[in-house]
Amino acid sequence: MTRTVKCRKYNEELPGLDRPPYPGAKGQDIFEHISQKAWKEWQDHQTMLINEKRLNMMNAEDRKFIQAEMDKFFAGEDYAQAEGYVPPSN
């Protein structure tokens, strides 16, 4: 049986992650409140940000930027986009 969570991003019950994606409290919070759907969308968006903004994940400032954008993404706030990117309309 698939584990479900009340997804923070979509505000509905959706299938949850199989395990926390990070160690510690942040990973546990994501595990308990973020759906597989929202996590996959974040991973795709994160990849686009890293590539388009040429971020280096070895750089502490770039990691802080990605962390802050992830928090905004899941909270439904305005978050950074790749310049010129227009999301597909559903």
UniProtKB/Swiss-Prot annotation:
Looking at the UniProt record for this protein, which Gene Ontology cellular component terms does it annotate, in alphabetical order? cytosol
Pfam families (alphabetical): Iron_traffic (PF04362)
- Extract one GO BP annotation from the record: cellular response to oxidative stress
- SUPFAM superfamilies (UniProt xref): YggX-like (SSF111148)
What InterPro entries does the database record attribute to this sequence? Fe_traffick_prot_YggX (IPR007457), Fe_traffick_prot_YggX_sf (IPR036766)
* Superkingdom in the source lineage: Bacteria
**GO MF annotations for this entry?**
iron ion binding
Alphabetically sorted, this entry's keywords are:
Iron
HAMAP family hit by this protein: Fe_traffic_YggX
Q: What does this protein do?
A: Could be a mediator in iron transactions between iron acquisition and iron-requiring processes, such as synthesis and/or repair of Fe-S clusters in biosynthetic enzymes.
Question: Into which family does the record put it?
Answer: Belongs to the Fe(2+)-trafficking protein family.
| Name of this protein | Probable Fe(2+)-trafficking protein
Q: Which organism is it from?
A: Pseudomonas entomophila (strain L48)
